[in-house]
């Protein structure tokens, strides 16, 4: 059996316009508006979807809560440039660039909605 391929990750957001602006600056691409409350960014063949249920007419879905350590990890070619983009776009740096014991160079941040995100130097990815 072939291993399933991850193709989309959905991040609930409270304001689709702010999310689009933030991730557009951080990723350096405008992405694509799919519906009033969905905006997609192609991240190396995997869709990163910002989803605002209110803007999409879905209302309160209830029950889902973000765990503070539930990070989304993005591999990037230039860690320092990405850190600057996150700051410029209004993100909060939680932990500055550091090297983990397993060799990854990365930094932790929060987007404007408090969602935890991590950016890893693509040359140092540890995949097990």
Predicted regions span which residues?
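Conserved active-site tyrosine of GNAT-family acetyltransferases
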Residues: 19-24, 86, 114
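Vicinal oxygen chelate
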Residues: 1-7, 28-75, 81-110, 121-128
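Short glycine-/small-residue motifs
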Residues: 116-119
């Amino acid at each position: 059996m072939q291993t399933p391929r991850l193709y989309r990750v959905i991040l609930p957001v409270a304001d689709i316009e702010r999310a689009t602006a933030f991730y557009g600056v951080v990723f350096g691409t405008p992405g694509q508006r799919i519906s009033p409350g969905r905006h997609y960014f192609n991240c190396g063949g995997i869709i990163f979807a910002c989803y605002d249920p209110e803007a999409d007419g879905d209302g309160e879905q209830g029950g889902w809560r973000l765990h503070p350590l539930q990070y989304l990890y993005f591999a990037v070619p230039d860690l320092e440039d990405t850190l600057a983009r996150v700051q410029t776009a209004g993100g909060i740096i939680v932990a500055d660039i550091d090297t983990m014991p397993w060799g990854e160079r990365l930094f932790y941040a929060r987007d404007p909605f408090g969602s935890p995100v991590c950016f890893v130097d693509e040359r140092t990815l540890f995949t097990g």
